[in-house]
């Protein structure tokens, strides 16, 4: 039998997507009492088959022996289900060196020849024994449900073929009733790594295989509920509700259904209705279906802010009114519509604070547990996200249940992407693939229909545009008129989308690509005849050290009502845990498993690291998206305005806390409750008079809105919003200075003052030694610094085998920034004034590219005052930084001693990503100043610093700084954090100016021009003590 089944090669026939698979439906549990269904108790009718299975591997399905159907093979090993076999420690797949995790963004991981896939098609053979209760065998129907198998599989039970399925992200359900026997039953599942379905699953993610979601058995009585779709409706005033229930029953003649709606423990609506419908057409009515409505006066509404849920139970009753089985669903009363060019929930226009989320676990790959899903969603809620896009496939069922309960809007997306096709829409225009396309959305809608959190259906991602999408759109709009549909392919504004949903369109700049232009956002919504809302399905590419310019998007969203937000790309770095040869853990990306083709670290685009530790960029997103506006109105008296962006919630759990600070020291503080209606505002006077601030001081007002009580997603004292408002202080007067003592040497100058002694080298013009209390502070001379270890956004290309000549790294290399030759052009020493002035030239060949003038003032109190002018040649590109580098000795910072600074913090920040980095007096251990991005780059900058205390060294002025055990050169050469080796000493970068990091995308020059360091003149200064 196995030979005949394999010989059919269903897995490379696009017209065959399944054989004997049951129709898709909403989740079923077959509770045998209405009370159990109401209380969501474990159902005895459902049994999990997760756990240890047996596993054998073959290089192709044709090599699997026939007798595997009835007995395990000698080489079979234990394997965990759910799991990806490439990540299972017991997997003996080293026999096929290419069967490893593969990361590729666009390219198919095999030759592109649809619907054919390679003959060398890794095949996993899963098996296990199970038994079922005797009463299951006696009557009713026993089903098996595979929640997710990648990419296709044949199912056998007790040596007999049951069926076939593909589409790795939706359930495959089969009727096992006729295959079962008493005692032990044997399941055998032949899983193929590649299938024609793989051409439709070309998402930007790791490609791995296996039974990666749960497997379960479900027993249903002979007469049972087959499918139930629940549609909440609100009247035109969004006050009263009605619940439409459409259901289908097997063998339903003479039966009836009882529906009960509960609000907590209170029953609020009931009805009983016989199975059967009114006449549908001239041929009559359905005898296995029913439609009914529950009227509910003034129900509590569901939204992401107020996720109130009712519980609906449906009980199938026999002719005598006795219960047969019950099903139940969480219900949220909410209305989704597009009206007046705006996406609305319950009449109010939304602002989508969204994230794209892949299902990814650092250890188990595509296997995500309910606890891990909850961790992600709680982090999102705590960082002011209100929406999640299931990119790019239907998710684990638990995600939707939790979004219903915690309060997050969901874009549910079909498992469809053909990014690697040329043209991208090739398959969408081929009628032979139409059914495969359509089925991907119809089955998703069937499974997820009842979740109130789902407010938008998505037809998939990056699959071009063709008649298949029109068919998908038309089917969804007919099957579910209660939700809009979106689809980005074909230019983001085709007839197959209700929402303009571009990816990586910019606030300020047109990108006129052929066939699929991306207009500047405000321009797009103003195009003639365009009335749809615009919501970015992807924006702010958070790859490594990124998210520069994020605040500009949020200013645009608030300035233009039809710009209704978007979904950051993306939530988590898709790094996988791997060991170095010497046993150290690191996060692997494309190529680290020997996988080809690969797109390197392009899988690491997250706001959180693989272990869910936040990137510094996550704090920027939280601040930009916060649901309150806080504005300083007047200084005398100190008056602020608070504006709520909540659409549905009153501020019943929010208090305002405020602090008045001078140079980081709190001089006054207080708090008060907030009583704001939804979208309301209020003014508060905090102080009648401001205190007098010291001359030259930094003074500011910190405002924070906190929740005094815990919520289902936050702890006591959770901070929802924060704002810092600068306050004026008198200017300080310059202090008279006394020059230090100068001693001329043969090759330089020695300067002594207080506890410090410096040596200037005549040949280089640089400070090459600095002793304090007899201890050397420098490992090499202080020098100009113009380079940074390239960021992912600087590298600028997502393709592993293409260089991008317009990328910043390429432009810097072309300009010779990596090979500048230094010459001291002149040095003028004025001992009586305590001043040394040096001109430095930086050349590529004979061409002068950079000219700097360093004015050193050495004071008797031990201070070296630096005033630095920089002239950048006209032909140079924007520089990454303009500053100075100091390689300090280890003695500068004692073991365990912390670094403190007065400036922006506490987390890493850059000139175009500092909205959330408040001024303060911060302290941090040295190692915390280093941000360990999966792919090492420049990191750890702190901007707008006035004072830096680094052990024995103090720096004053206005500068940015970073401090690391690793040089920029080592960071530039490393590929993983485990490649970094402490070089001895500390690398201190003091920057007068630093170019932005960008982040609109990671494959073009995404740094906004106002954050470039253009050719021209620059001046900065600082004081070293």
Curated annotation (Swiss-Prot):
E.C. numbers = 3.2.1.23
Q: Where does Mg(2+) 1 bind?
A: 417, 419, 462
EC class name: hydrolase
One GO molecular function term of this record is: magnesium ion binding
Which amino acid positions bind substrate, per UniProt?
105, 204, 462, 538-541, 605, 1003
Q: Kindly give the SMART domains that the UniProt entry links to this protein.
A: Bgal_small_N (SM01038)
Query: Could you tell me what the cofactor note in this record states?
Result: Binds 2 magnesium ions per monomer. Binds 1 sodium ion per monomer.
Q: What residues correspond to the site Transition state stabilizer?
A: 358, 392
Essential cofactor(s): Mg(2+); Na(+)
Q: Which GO terms describe its cellular component?
A: beta-galactosidase complex
Q: Which reaction does it catalyse?
A: Hydrolysis of terminal non-reducing beta-D-galactose residues in beta-D-galactosides
User: Which PANTHER family does the UniProt record give?
Assistant: BETA-GALACTOSIDASE (PTHR46323:SF2)
Q: How does it assemble?
A: Homotetramer.
Cite the HAMAP family for this sequence: Beta_gal
Question: Record's family?
Answer: Belongs to the glycosyl hydrolase 2 family.
Q: What is this protein called?
A: Beta-galactosidase
């Amino acid at each position: 039998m196995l030979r005949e089944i394999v010989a059919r090669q269903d897995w490379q026939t696009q017209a065959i997507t399944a054989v004997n698979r049951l129709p898709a439906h909403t989740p079923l549990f077959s509770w045998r009492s209405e009370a159990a269904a109401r209380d969501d108790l474990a159902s005895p009718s459902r049994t999990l088959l997760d756990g240890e299975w047996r596993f054998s591997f073959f290089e192709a399905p044709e090599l699997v022996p026939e007798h595997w159907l009835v007995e395990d093979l000698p080489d079979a090993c234990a394997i965990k289900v759910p799991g990806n076999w490439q990540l299972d420690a017991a997997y003996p797949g080293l026999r096929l060196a290419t069967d490893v995790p593969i990361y590729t963004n666009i390219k198919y991981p095999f030759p592109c020849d649809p619907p054919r896939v390679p003959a060398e098609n890794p095949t996993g053979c899963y098996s296990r024994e199970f038994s079922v209760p005797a009463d299951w065998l006696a009557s009713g129907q026993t089903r098996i449900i595979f929640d997710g198998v990648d990419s296709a599989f044949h199912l056998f039970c007790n040596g007999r073929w049951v069926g076939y399925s593909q589409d790795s992200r939706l359930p495959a359900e089969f009727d096992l009733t006729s295959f079962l026997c008493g005692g032990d039953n044997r399941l055998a599942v032949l899983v193929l790594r590649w299938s024609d379905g793989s051409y439709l699953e070309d998402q930007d993610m790791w490609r791995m295989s296996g039974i990666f979601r749960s497997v379960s058995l479900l027993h249903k009585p002979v007469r049972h509920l087959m499918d139930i779709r629940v549609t909440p409706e609100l009247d035109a005033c969004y006050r009263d509700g009605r619940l439409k229930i459409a259901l289908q029953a097997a063998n339903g003649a003479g039966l009836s259904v009882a529906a009960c709606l509960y609000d907590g423990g209170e029953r609020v609506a009931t009805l009983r209705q016989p199975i059967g419908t009114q006449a549908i057409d001239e041929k009559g009515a359905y005898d296995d279906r029913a439609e009914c409505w529950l009227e509910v006066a003034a129900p509590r509404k569901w939204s992401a802010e107020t996720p109130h849920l009712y519980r609906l139970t449906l009980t199938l009753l026999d002719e005598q009114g006795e219960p047969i089985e019950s099903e139940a669903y969480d219900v949220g009363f909410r209305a989704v519509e597009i009206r007046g060019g705006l996406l609305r929930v319950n009449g109010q226009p939304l602002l989508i604070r969204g994230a794209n989320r892949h299902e990814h676990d650092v250890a188990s790959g595509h296997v995500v547990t309910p606890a891990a899903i909850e961790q992600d969603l709680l982090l999102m809620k705590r960082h002011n996200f209100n929406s999640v896009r299931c990119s790019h496939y239907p998710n684990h069922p638990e995600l939707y249940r939790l979004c219903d309960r915690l309060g997050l809007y969901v874009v549910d997306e079909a498992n469809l992407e053909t990014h690697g096709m040329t043209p991208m829409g090739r398959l969408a225009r081929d009628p032979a693939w139409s059914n495969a396309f359509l089925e991907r959305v119809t089955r998703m809608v069937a499974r997820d229909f009842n979740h109130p959190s789902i407010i938008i259906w998505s037809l998939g991602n990056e699959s071009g545009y063709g008649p298949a999408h029109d068919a998908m759109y038309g089917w969804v709009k007919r099957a579910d008129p209660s939700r809009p549909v979106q689809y980005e392919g074909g230019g983001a504004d085709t007839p197959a989308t209700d929402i303009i949903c571009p990816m990586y369109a910019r606030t300020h700049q047109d990108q006129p690509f052929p066939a699929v232009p991306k207009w500047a956002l405000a321009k797009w919504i103003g195009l003639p005849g365009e009335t749809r809302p615009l919501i970015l399905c992807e924006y702010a590419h958070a790859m490594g050290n990124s998210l520069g310019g994020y605040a500009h998007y949020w200013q645009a969203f608030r300035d233009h009502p039809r710009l209704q937000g978007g979904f950051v790309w993306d939530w988590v770095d898709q790094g996988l845990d791997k060991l170095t040869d010497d046993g150290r853990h690191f996060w692997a990306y494309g190529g680290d498993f020997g996988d080809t083709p690969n797109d390197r670290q392009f899988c690491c685009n997250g706001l959180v690291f693989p272990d869910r530790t936040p990137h510094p960029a996550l704090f920027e997103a939280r601040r930009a998206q916060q649901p309150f506006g806080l504005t300083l109105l007047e200084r005398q008296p100190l008056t602020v305005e608070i504006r709520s962006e909540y659409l549905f919630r009153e501020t019943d759990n929010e208090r305002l806390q405020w602090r008045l600070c001078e140079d980081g020291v709190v001089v006054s503080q207080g708090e008060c409750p907030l009583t704001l209606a939804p979208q309301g505002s209020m003014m508060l006077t905090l102080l009648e008079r401001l205190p007098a601030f010291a001359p030259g001081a930094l003074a500011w007002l910190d405002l924070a809105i906190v929740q005094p009580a815990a919520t289902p997603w936050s702890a006591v004292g959770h901070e929802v919003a924060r704002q810092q408002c600068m306050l004026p202080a008198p200017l300080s007067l310059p202090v008279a200075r006394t020059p230090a003592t100068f001693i001329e040497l043969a090759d330089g100058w020695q300067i002594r003052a207080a506890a410090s002694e410096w040596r200037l080298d005549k040949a280089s013009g640089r400070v090459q030694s600095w002793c304090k209390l007899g201890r050397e502070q420098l490992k090499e001379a202080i020098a100009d610094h113009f380079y940074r270890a390239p960021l992912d956004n600087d590298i600028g290309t997502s393709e592993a085998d293409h260089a991008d000549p317009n990328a910043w790294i390429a432009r810097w290399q072309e300009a010779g920034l990596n090979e500048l030759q230094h010459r001291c052009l002149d040095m003028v020493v004025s001992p009586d004034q305590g001043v040394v002035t040096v001109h430095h030239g930086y050349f590529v060949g004979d061409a002068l590219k950079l000219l700097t003038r360093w004015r050193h003032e050495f004071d008797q109190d031990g201070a070296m005052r630096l005033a630095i002018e920089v002239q950048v040649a006209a032909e140079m590109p924007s520089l990454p930084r303009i500053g100075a580098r100091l390689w300090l000795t280890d003695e500068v910072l004692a073991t365990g001693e912390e670094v403190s600074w007065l400036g922006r913090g506490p987390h890493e920040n850059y000139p175009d990503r500092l909205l959330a980095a408040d001024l303060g007096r911060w302290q941090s251990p040295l190692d915390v100043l280093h941000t360990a991005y999966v792919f090492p780059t420049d990191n750890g900058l702190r901007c707008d610093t006035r004072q830096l205390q680094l052990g024995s060294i103090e720096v004053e002025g206005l500068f940015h700084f970073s401090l690391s055990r690793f040089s920029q050169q080592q960071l530039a050469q490393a590929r993983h954090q485990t490649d970094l080796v402490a070089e001895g000493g500390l690398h201190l970068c003091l920057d007068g100016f630093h170019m932005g990091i960008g982040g609109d995308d990671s494959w073009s020059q995404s740094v906004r021009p106002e954050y470039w360091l253009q050719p021209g003149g620059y001046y900065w200064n600082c004081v070293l003590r």
